Amino acid sequence: GGLEDTETLGVLARTHKDLGLGARDPALRSKHLEAAFRLYERAYASSRQRGAAGGAYYTGINAATVAVLRGELDEARWIAAEVADVCHAAVDVAADPAIEYWRRATLGEAALILGDAPAAARHYAAAMALAQGRYGDLSTTRRQSRLLAQHLPVDDEWLDEALSIPPVLVFTGHMVDQVGRAASRFPAALEGAVQPAIRAAIAAMRPLASYGSAACGADILCLEAVRELGGETHVVLPFPAEEFRRTSVEIAAGDWGARFDRLLEHADSVTITSDHRASGSAAPFEYANLVLTGLGRLRAQVLDTALRGLAVWDRGSGGESGGSASV
């Protein structure tokens, strides 16, 4: 019946595995890990019997991983060697890159369990080349490899580099000075010097995604640089775009308005944190700053990668509420 298909057995096994890893009581941990192993083992045997290679190496490598977690290294290595054979027999030069990614990642995990670090590194490198920006898949593989390394007699220092995921960027910075501003912070004449400095800083990080606002000046320069370098741009505005454009973009001379429009049109997401502007209050800006930093932090945590910050501001300025210094 439905309870015997590979996918259902895999979900049940994953649930027991997670419960086991989260259990503080050793007896409860052992109980859940044993249940996970039996379910993965059953699904693996069923997939092999049906000749379903994909299901076989998915459930098989998970059975081997749970065996490692249970301290059954001989059994883990026996299963891992068998899974590696299944993967090698399943080579398909016309395979979808996503399918081939998991075959290669599985070979990497099998090699790790078998104690063959050079082979693991080769397979992980091949998987990385096939990932094509699917950072969720990469983070899953990275977590699994770290989990294995914690329970195996292997040197794991190379794993983070072998399965590296670009960082997430949160940026902030001053707006270009409004005409007639008494205390200058970002004179329009400095754009030509600031722009390449921002691009160089972002190019050194190569973020997969960025989170920030879109005011004239540093925000727009950061968004343009990230987009030019191929990263995602996620814009967070404190109130609707039309009003934000009027109050935080068009205040400076130049083509900031047109650049703002282009960036919002091509942004991966635009989040509006309030449906109106509270005139005279910094609260909408403070809240938007909390949201954009929170979104960046959450994305970094989900992908198990670093969170980086970039600020373009005058350290000598007071740092008004809701301004650059508050991020």
Model-derived segments and spans:
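Acidic/glycine-enriched connector segments
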Residues: 1-89, 164-327
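"A position-specific structural signal for the A-helix of alpha-solenoid helical repeats
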Residues: 11, 15-18, 62, 106-113, ...
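Alpha-solenoid helical repeat scaffolds
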Residues: 18, 22-25, 69, 73, ...
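TPR/TPR-like (Sel1-like) alpha-helical repeat modules
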Residues: 37, 81, 85, 117-135
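Short coil/turn linkers that connect adjacent helices within long alpha-helical scaffolds
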Residues: 49-52, 91-95, 134-136
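A short, acidic, amphipathic alpha-helical segment used as a generic capping/interface helix at domain edges
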Residues: 87-96, 100-104, 109-114, 122-125, ...
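Eukaryotic RNA-binding helical-repeat scaffolds
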Residues: 118, 155, 162-170
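Terminal, low-structured helical/coil segments at or just beyond the last alpha-helical repeat
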Residues: 137-163
